[in-house]
């Protein structure tokens, strides 16, 4: 018999797991990892910003995509991938970053999907589904940390220097600033580890004596708030 068990801690863990997965996915797909120095739409490198060529703007660069302003372009800003193939990503460090982040995000999305069904199923192969998911989240967090540590090592690539100036180098941004996607990825990584720790509390909440009493009474829907 399937028992639907809902507790504050289990629902909070499910919600946080989904938020962690989506925050990492959105950050990975975004072009706002780096915000370049101000320049005119058709100007070259000039730390002075605006020129007679047009109003100054700041292009953005992601792991595999970018946003630039194109003169006479109807939409003003053109966003899309600069790398058609994996080998065209700005540097080997960013290629490694993409691999580790993708692996971590894949695990987080799998856990987020599974977490939705933890109200009905609390074990898998005689193992607590919360503990298994918590372990997967911890592994995903390690992948994310490795990816985020490798990411700044690619700041010395030629592609980054086009956006950040010639002074940019590994772990030095030059004229760029970190965009919201980078900070979102950092926050998602921290949240990932919090979810891994909190999964133990979700397991305790769904296997408490109060829950067992409700099951013995024959209830199929158990809601403990």
UniProtKB/Swiss-Prot annotation:
GO cellular component: membrane
Transmembrane intervals: 11-31, 99-119, 129-149, 178-198
Keywords: Fertilization, Membrane, Transmembrane, Transmembrane helix
UniProt record, GO biological process: development of primary female sexual characteristics; development of primary male sexual characteristics; positive regulation of fertilization; single fertilization
Main localization (coarse): membrane
Signal peptide (UniProt feature, chain positions): none
Bilayer topology term: Multi-pass membrane protein
Compartments, as annotated in UniProt: Membrane
Superkingdom, taxonomy of origin: Eukaryota
InterPro entries with a match to the protein in the record: LHFPL
Xref: Pfam families: L_HMGIC_fpl (PF10242)
Function: Plays a role in fertility. Involved in distal reproductive tract development.
UniProt family annotation: Belongs to the LHFP family.
UniProt protein name: LHFPL tetraspan subfamily member 2a protein
Gene name of this polypeptide: lhfpl2a
